[in-house]
């Protein structure tokens, strides 16, 4: 397996990040237009034919454009400034001080110096299972997080391979790409959940006010449209997540000149990757191996279309042939 040059990979991921940033508001706009069309089709009696329906749809959509732009900007601003704290809370991570574990700091510093990289922050998850992940969107927020179990159960060469894997995610800028994709998917998930909860609440009060029937229809349409966006955005996110693991494995092998050490580490990680605190699927894909029960059956159904990680056996086999 040949590793793509660092400059090439950075350029590709920067381009993909830009495409996602453009695609996100475009998809929101398309789905908003679909919602407007369905809403008018089901709620307005059209005596003038299809032309009038489209004209009303266009007018409603134009009126909503400022809200679309404002919503997208607010969502990304919030995500930009809060992604690190949200991920830390979702994984149960905390800062690891140098005095707690000089060994980890020495390994990270040596690898960073060999690559001319700025030292990232280091966090630890107090869990005896074996896992790790990288996060952040710039040099001020880049972080390598290791579980207590992976620190205690891997030797220095294996741990160096894992750290190199996470540093490759940072160096290639695919951490930023993945977080953008997580934000991209998150808004559709949020909208679908809001609509679903609203429909449930409205159904309880429907008998008190027959006018609620129209409101429920609007919410159902919103939920359907949001679910469509969530489905396609999730497929895109999974595809990005799977490919980045292969690239990070290859980058770590190149960085350490010891692919067998990372292969050995992955074999140990696969035996116990479950991190108890991790419940969110979008956060789970950040890890070197899926930290939940799905890690053992990630490729079941649809040939792995919905898998966040490639088969770890395949990753090990590639490293052993590197």
From Swiss-Prot:
Subcellular location: Cell inner membrane
CDD domains linked: M48B_Htpx_like
Cofactor note: Binds 1 zinc ion per subunit.
Keyword Transport attached: no
GO biological process: proteolysis
GO molecular function: metalloendopeptidase activity; zinc ion binding
Pfam families in alphabetical order: Peptidase_M48
Classification via HAMAP family: Pept_M48_protease_HtpX
Protein name: Protease HtpX homolog
Lineage, highest ranks first: Bacteria, Pseudomonadati, Bacteroidota, Bacteroidia, Bacteroidales
Gene encoding the protein: htpX
């Amino acid at each position: 397996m040949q590793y793509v040059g660092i400059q090439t990979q950075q350029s590709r991921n920067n381009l993909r990040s830009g495409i996602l940033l453009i695609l996100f508001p475009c998809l929101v706009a398309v789905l908003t237009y679909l919602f407007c069309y369905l809403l008018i089709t089901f709620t307005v009696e059209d005596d003038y034919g299809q032309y009038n329906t489209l004209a009303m749809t266009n007018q409603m959509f134009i009126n909503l454009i400022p809200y679309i732009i404002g919503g997208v900007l607010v969502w990304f601003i919030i995500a930009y400034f809060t992604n690190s704290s949200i991920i830390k809370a979702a994984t149960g991570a905390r800062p690891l001080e140098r005095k707690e574990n000089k060994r980890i700091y020495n390994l990270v510093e040596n690898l960073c110096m060999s690559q001319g990289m700025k030292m990232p922050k280091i966090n630890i998850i107090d869990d005896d299972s074996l896992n790790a992940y990288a996060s952040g969107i710039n040099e001020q927020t880049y972080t390598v997080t290791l579980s207590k179990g992976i620190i205690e159960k891997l030797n220095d060469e294996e741990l160096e391979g894992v750290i190199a894997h996470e540093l490759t995610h940072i160096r290639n800028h695919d951490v930023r790409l993945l977080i953008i994709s997580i934000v991209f998917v998150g808004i559709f998930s949020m909208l679908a959940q809001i609509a679903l909860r609203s429909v449930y609440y409205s159904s309880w009060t429907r008998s008190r006010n027959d006018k609620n029937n129209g409101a429920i229809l609007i919410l159902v349409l919103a939920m359907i449209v949001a679910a469509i966006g969530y489905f396609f955005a999730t497929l895109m996110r999974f595809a990005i997540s799977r490919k980045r693991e292969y690239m990070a494995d290859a980058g770590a092998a190149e960085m350490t000149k010891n692919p067998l050490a990372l292969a050995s580490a992955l074999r140990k990680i696969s035996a116990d990757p479950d991190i108890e605190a991790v419940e969110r699927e979008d956060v789970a894909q950040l890890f070197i191996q899926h930290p939940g029960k799905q890690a053992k059956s990630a490729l079941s159904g649809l040939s792995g279309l919905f898998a966040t990680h490639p088969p770890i056996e395949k990753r090990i086999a590639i490293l052993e042939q590197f």
